[in-house]
């Protein structure tokens, strides 16, 4: 009998598709010591059908598309300011809801836990807007989306590339023209446990409960975004990309999921989703006349279905063609290669497992010397004779 889905847990993306795939409901998702969700198999319920492993999307090669590349932003400036980039997701979602469909995306739920939820009307979309720099639990949403699609109800499912692949794995051979999938260029997903621990630290510091957290606040502009926590007592905690500890740690790859560092699900124009969204970084050089610092999206229409969905939202979009894909990859390297783990990742988690998130410790880790700098320091402190011997060896 199985105890887990994959022999190599480092490959598991935590999409949760196996929970829906299992015919005996023998799988649940449980957090590990780093705070990431992994499948746990109930050996007494398992019938060794191996469906979970056979349909697991981890490590699979993605189909290559000749995507149509666009720059785009919603004409509605207020919507752009509420969105991480240009507001394209909301326009796509509104169209699906208008047709009687359901939109799935990441939102804050109970106890500030990030999870995938379903929106049945436009008022429920607000919680899905904006980036969530923490891995969302999509387990239930995948199962619910599959059920809706079997009833021929339109569904827009947005998420990381691995979550989109999880949904498609759960659907199996069931193909539906009612499904529209939207992923994004993913930097990697941080630990839900680490984020929860950080919120606990903030609440102790402010003596109040966190009511809201924004990862991409645009008060200082789209490019110079900041993170803002809002508390029940009316106080706010805000910081920039290099001063807000959790945001800084995420951007420095300090606590991303292990599978993110060998991700096979986001490579150039290889995507499983109909549409891929990203920030149009470098807009000030690519299209300076359109860059008002309220947000611009880079859009990849990967399939005919994706192109049609964008055309249906066309009246509400300012869009233009982008022909230089290579230029986009220079501004956003995650389009091509997964990020490398921070060299102090292991040191962070070793202490985190005993003490939880410690902002001062995180900033010290990230601002301290790296391996190259430490090596140079050791060399500079060598005796003069040793320095001469090293120099002589190099010159030979």
Label each residue range with its predicted role.
Residues 84-87, 110, 157-167, 188-190:
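Gly/Ser/Thr-rich loops at beta-strand to alpha-helix junctions
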Residues 99-102, 203, 208-396:
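Long, compositionally biased charged/polar accessory segments in the mid-to-C-terminal portions
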Residues 179-201:
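Short, flexible loop segments at boundaries between secondary-structure elements
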Residues 1-2, 44-151, 325-345, 350-358:
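Flanking helices and flexible, charged tails adjoining ferredoxin-like Fe-S electron-transfer domains
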Residues 10-25, 45-59, 160-166, 256-269:
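Local cysteine-cluster metal-coordination motifs and their immediate loop/turn environment
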Residues 2-13, 41-47, 152-155, 242-260, ...:
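Immediate flanking context of iron-sulfur cluster ligation sites
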Residues 4-5, 11, 17-40, 50-67, ...:
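Iron-sulfur cluster-binding cysteine motifs and their immediate structural context
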Residues 132-181:
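Conserved nucleotide-cofactor-binding alpha/beta core module
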């Amino acid at each position: 009998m199985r105890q887990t889905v994959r022999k190599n847990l480092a490959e598991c993306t935590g999409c949760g598709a196996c929970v829906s795939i299992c015919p005996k409901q023998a799988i649940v998702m449980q957090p590990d010591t780093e705070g990431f969700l992994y499948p746990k198999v109930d050996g007494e319920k398992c019938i060794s059908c191996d469906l979970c492993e056979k349909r697991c999307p981890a490590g699979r090669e993605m189909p290559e598309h000749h995507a149509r590349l666009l720059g785009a932003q919603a004409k509605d400036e207020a919507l752009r300011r509420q969105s991480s980039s240009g507001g394209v997701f909301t326009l796509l979602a509104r169209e699906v809801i208008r047709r009687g469909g359901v939109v799935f995306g990441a939102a804050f739920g109970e106890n500030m836990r990030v999870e995938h939820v379903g929106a049945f009307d436009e008022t429920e979309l607000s919680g899905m807007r904006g980036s969530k720099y923490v891995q969302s639990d999509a387990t239930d949403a995948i199962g619910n989306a599959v059920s809706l699609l079997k009833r021929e109800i339109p569904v827009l499912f947005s998420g990381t590339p691995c979550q989109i692949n999880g949904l498609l794995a759960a659907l199996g051979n069931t193909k539906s023209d009612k499904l529209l999938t939207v992923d994004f260029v993913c930097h990697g997903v941080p630990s839900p446990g680490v984020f929860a621990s950080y919120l606990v630290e903030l609440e102790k510091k402010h003596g109040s409960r966190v009511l809201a957290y924004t990862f991409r606040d645009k008060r200082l502009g789209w490019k110079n975004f900041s993170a803002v926590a809002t508390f029940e007592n009316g106080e706010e905690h805000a910081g920039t990309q290099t001063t807000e500890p959790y945001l800084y740690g995420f951007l420095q790859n300090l606590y991303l999921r292990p599978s993110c560092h060998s991700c096979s699900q986001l490579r150039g124009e290889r995507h499983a989703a109909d549409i891929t969204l990203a920030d149009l970084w470098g807009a000030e050089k690519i299209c300076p006349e359109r860059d008002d610092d309220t947000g611009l999206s880079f859009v990849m229409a990967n399939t005919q279905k994706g192109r049609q969905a964008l055309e249906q939202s066309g009246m509400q979009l300012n869009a233009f063609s982008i022909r230089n894909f290579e230029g986009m990859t220079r501004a956003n390297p995650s389009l091509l290669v997964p990020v490398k783990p921070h060299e102090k990742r292991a040191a962070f988690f070793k202490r985190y497992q005993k003490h939880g998130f410690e902002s001062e410790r995180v900033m010290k880790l990230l601002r301290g010397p790296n391996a190259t700098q430490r090596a140079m320091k050791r060399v500079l402190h060598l005796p003069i004779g040793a320095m001469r011997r090293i120099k002589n060896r190099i010159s030979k």
